[in-house]
């Protein structure tokens, strides 16, 4: 996913626009692809970034969020929606190794269950309360 995300970004920086689809072997627009066309290209900057690069996946039915931290850099997201009324902000601090437990700050207006995953399968589950939470 990171490779695809970076290639879409390279093409955007080169051409100044998004394309209908991209070349499979190069950071270039696909053959006969239409420019200024979001279509499937809308997935990498939104869904892929949130779900696969930031590692945030939600199960609305169970009010459960999985945060699978793979990055070493600090990152975050504000107002991540959970259900009709939920707004959650996640801030993950910079780490020095993948096996270092992530430090996560969460601000939420609804309670939910969190599974935090990192390293070689390490994980912790926590009930997150309304307000500011440090994990």
List PLM regions with ranges.
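Non-catalytic C-terminal accessory modules of carbohydrate-active enzymes
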Residues: 1-135
């Amino acid at each position: 996913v990171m490779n695809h995300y970076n290639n879409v970004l390279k093409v955007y920086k080169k051409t100044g626009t998004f394309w209908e689809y991209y070349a499979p072997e190069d950071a270039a627009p696909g053959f006969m692809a239409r420019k200024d066309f979001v279509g499937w290209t809308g997935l990498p900057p939104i869904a892929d970034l949130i779900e696969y690069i930031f590692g945030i996946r939600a199960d609305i039915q169970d009010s459960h969020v999985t945060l699978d931290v793979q990055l070493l850099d600090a990152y975050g997201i504000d107002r991540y929606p959970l259900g009709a009324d939920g707004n959650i902000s996640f801030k993950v601090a910079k780490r020095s190794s993948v096996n270092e437990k992530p430090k996560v700050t969460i601000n939420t207006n609804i309670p939910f269950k969190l599974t935090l995953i990192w390293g070689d399968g390490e994980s912790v589950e926590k009930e997150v309360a309304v307000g500011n939470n440090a994990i």
